Swiss-Prot record:
The gene is OMT2. GO terms for biological process: flavonoid metabolic process; methylation. Pathway: Flavonoid metabolism. This is 8-hydroxyquercetin 8-O-methyltransferase. It comes from the Eukaryota.
Length: 366
């Protein structure tokens, strides 16, 4: 066998081929996961209460009996991907007194995060990010590199993602549900392990806070703090507040309500550096009228290039960064890049707390 230049052995060639094939077909992992959520596989196993056999699972999901082998193959790849465990259970043989062993499936920590009843469920996020509106954009990435569009999304749809989301009610709902489900996870940590971040604050504005899922959790945890959600009219129009929570419609590039603190979760990564500096300057204006010595900006964002993280964590951050490249004008940033933005916007100091897994809490001080 003639080996390509730079490959020294047949084994190296075969390993290289397997590596390439693995990446060619890696989208199948995402689509298999999406299928599992749409079929309700995690919920069916959870409802069963014990490890569930293939036939029991097929019955619970009302699967076409002619396609039970397809369900077996779907479960096989999902077990391999770590979403389910396969165990042996004893089942009674029909018409006999004997029992025999059969394969059965149980939940893993990953699939428990896909349960509809789980407060920290990421199922809505998974369904949104695997929606064709997002995935079809990737077929235009190479074209985008050679044209003048701001993102591959614009190349595909002829408009920016925010413009598309405003015009498409279905996508708007999907996106807001995805952001709301993530809020449960963030709130569970912010309001327990990071309570000191909110010490001394009497008012806070959640900029780009969507339907208020994050702000509601913070407002409930800190009843003495006035919380305001600022977002576009198509997002917050018609939403009603409660005791210490209110909604304001508007564009953060035009104005941000005054407060002791400005909170932004996964907002700045949507924008390029110039736009981020503009947003941060608006935030600085919003807290400048406060006499509170604790005034600051609170960000929940990814910080790239963390030498202590795992290979999988780095890869996931790179996925997020490429998503920003394809869909909008933003990016994920290193600590050095974050620091430059803060200082360019007139802030004097910042503090990064790595407490949210892939993301960090960043406090920015005037």
């Amino acid at each position: 066998m003639a080996l390509p230049n730079g490959i020294s052995s047949k084994q190296e060639l075969l390993e290289a081929q397997a590596h390439v094939w693995n990446h060619i077909y890696s989208y199948i992992n995402s689509m298999s996961l999406k299928c599992a959520i749409q079929l309700g596989i995690p919920d069916a196993i959870h409802k069963h209460g014990n490890p569930i056999t293939l036939s029991q699972l097929a019955d619970a999901l009302n699967i076409n009996k002619a396609k039970s082998h397809g369900l077996f193959r779907l479960m096989r790849i999902l077990v391999h991907s770590g979403f389910f465990d396969k165990v042996k259970v004893k089942v009674k043989v029909e018409g006999e007194d004997e029992e025999e062993e059969e394969d059965a499936y149980s939940l893993t920590p990953a699939s428990r995060l896909l349960l509809r009843s789980e407060p920290l469920s990421v199922a809505p996020f998974a369904l949104a990010m695997s929606d064709p509106v997002y995935t079809e954009t990737w077929h235009h990435l190479s074209e985008w590199f050679r044209n003048d569009a701001v993102a591959a999304f614009d190349t595909k749809y002829g408009m920016t993602f925010p413009e598309y989301a405003v015009a498409d009610d279905r996508l708007n709902v999907l996106f807001n549900e995805a952001m709301a489900c993530d809020a449960g996870f963030v709130n569970s940590i912010l309001t327990t392990e990071c309570r000191e971040i909110f010490d001394g604050l009497e008012s806070m504005v959640d900029v780009g806070g969507g339907t208020g899922a994050t702000a509601k959790g913070i407002a409930a945890a800190f009843p003495g703090m006035e919380c305001t959600v600022l977002d576009l009219p198509n997002v917050v129009g018609g939403l009603k507040g409660s005791e210490n929570l209110s909604f304001v419609s508007g564009d953060m590039f035009d104005f941000i309500p005054h407060a002791d603190a400005i909170f932004m979760k996964f907002i700045l990564h949507d924008w390029n550096d110039e736009e981020c500096v503009k947003i941060l300057k608006k935030c600085k204006e919003a807290i400048s009228r406060s006499n509170n010595s604790c005034r600051k900006i609170i960000l929940v964002e990814i910080v790239m290039e963390d030498e202590k993280e795992t290979h999988e964590a780095t890869e996931t951050k790179l996925f997020f960064d490429m998503q920003m490249l394809a869909i909008i004008t933003g990016k994920e940033r290193s600590e050095k890049e974050w620091g430059k933005l803060f200082f360019d916007a007139g802030f004097t100091n910042y503090k990064i707390t790595r407490v949210l897994g892939l993301r960090s809490v960043i406090e920015v001080f005037p």
